[in-house]
Design a protein with these regions (language model features):
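Hydrophobic residues within beta-strands of alpha/beta enzymes
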Residues: 34-36, 114
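Histidine-centered catalytic micro-motifs
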Residues: 2-12, 36-41
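Gly/lys/ser-thr-rich phosphate-binding loops in alpha/beta enzymes
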Residues: 7, 12-14, 22, 85-87, ...
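Active-site mouth loops of central-metabolism enzymes
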Residues: 5-19, 92-96, 124-125
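Conserved, mostly hydrophobic/aromatic
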Residues: 6, 26, 114
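Extended substrate/RNA-proximal surfaces in nucleic-acid metabolism proteins
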Residues: 44-125
Length: 125
């Protein structure tokens, strides 16, 4: 089975394509299992004003709202393309101390998988 479990869309700061575009490209390339796993720091754009609200303030609410919006969008596409390609919903987490910190309570269990980046770097947390 041909598969790709590391792809990014416009939800990531390093991707520019719509999710539909990369799914269509995967189908055209013969991929049968396709994972979309955008960077959590891209899905959730950091706004400096959130810092003043603390981790349990409005910024935390935005984390939840944006992650659920991303999850729901990919979920709709999973249904749309069922029978043509199997789509997994992932999220990519950064372990570097200077990255946008994740709230301690953050629940990502509803994703199919998570990729952890920079885990081999000395300064990784």
């Amino acid at each position: 089975m041909l598969q790709d479990l590391h792809s990014h869309t416009y939800y990531s700061y390093c991707g520019g394509d719509r999710p539909e575009e990369i799914i269509e490209a995967a189908i055209a390339g013969g991929i049968e299992l396709f994972g979309i796993n955008d960077h959590v720091n891209g899905v959730i754009t950091h706004v400096p004003e959130w810092d003043a609200l603390g981790k349990d303030g409005w910024g935390s609410w935005v984390y939840d709202r944006m992650l659920h919006r991303y999850h729901d969008h990919i979920g709709l596409l999973r249904e749309k393309y069922a029978g043509r390609i199997k789509i997994l919903q992932g999220i990519e987490l950064c372990t570097l101390p200077y990255a946008l910190p994740l709230p301690e309570y953050l629940d990502i269990s509803y994703f199919d998988y998570a990729l952890i980046e920079h885990i081999d770097m000395k300064e990784s947390i």
